[in-house]
Amino acid sequence: MNILNIYNEFDINNFDLSVDHYGSEKCDRGYSFGPTIRDNYVIHFILEGKGKLTINQHTLDLAAGDIFLLPKDISTFYQADLQMPWSYIWIGFSGSKAENILKQSSLFKRFYCHSGRSSKLFSQMMTIIQFANTPLTSVNELLMVGELYKLLAALIEEFPLSHLEESNSSTKAYVNQVKKIIHSQYGSSLRVNDIAKKLNLSRSYLYKIFRKSTNLSIKEYILQVRMKRSQYLLENPKLSIAEISNSVGFSDSLAFSKAFKNYFGKSPSKFRKEIQNN
């Protein structure tokens, strides 16, 4: 099969992951594309020749066997070499799961990796490109999405995150989960031990990673969320102090008033009067 100068585009937007377009091209000398910002992800595999990729104001020299990623929502520019212009194949894809899957590979942050035609990754890209020979049916669209999952699995297998990157990624995920729990349950009796058990982590480890990320302890963050919410609720004159106290996780309105005064330097009643006077 002649893989050069193929382009197919699809309008499939009902999947967690979908193939938007794929193709191959033998570029003319100095051929360039961009700078442009795209709304999907595109993986290129360089078959032969050389070229340059500029991303985040940093230019990479790339050659045959290299893979490069054009990320979503970031300006990119790429250009074929003047003497040895490159040829490449590419797969463009999108979907709600695309970013989280890509983040499991070092390609997501580095934007390029070196592979080869003997790799599973190249073989899987070629499998998708060869759909150019098949009619566009709903069955083939589903098959193509299945092959895209296999491609991304091969990418993660060949270029996984380093242990440090994986650790940092997991830490960020835990911190975000803690924040999500707090924002959804600040109105109840929320304890740090309960959050740690829910995430199957030790309290000391959770405290350490959360404080490192936010400069706050989990208790301090819970209080911050409760105080900011109570500040908003106090703007409604129809709500009593007791009602507001209960809504932000305090069963005792006196304890709430004390916490509010310690946090803002004034009582809830005084804060409300100042709002009404303004």
Curated annotation (Swiss-Prot):
Residues 193-214, 241-264 bind DNA. GO terms for molecular function: DNA-binding transcription factor activity; sequence-specific DNA binding. Residues 176-274 form the HTH araC/xylS-type domain. InterPro entries: AraC-bd, Homeodomain-like_sf, HTH-like, HTH_AraC, HTH_AraC-typ_CS, Tscrpt_reg_AraC-type_HTH. SUPFAM superfamilies: Homeodomain-like, Regulatory protein AraC. Keywords: Activator, DNA-binding, Transcription, Transcription regulation. It holds the Pfam family AraC_binding. The keyword DNA-binding applies. SMART domains: HTH_ARAC. The keyword DNA-binding applies. Regulatory protein for the msm operon for multiple sugar metabolism. Activates the transcription of the msmEFGK, aga, dexB and gftA genes. PANTHER family: ARAC-FAMILY TRANSCRIPTIONAL REGULATOR, MMSAB OPERON REGULATORY PROTEIN. This is Msm operon regulatory protein. It comes from Streptococcus mutans serotype c (strain ATCC 700610 / UA159). The lineage of its organism: Bacteria, Bacillati, Bacillota, Bacilli, Lactobacillales.
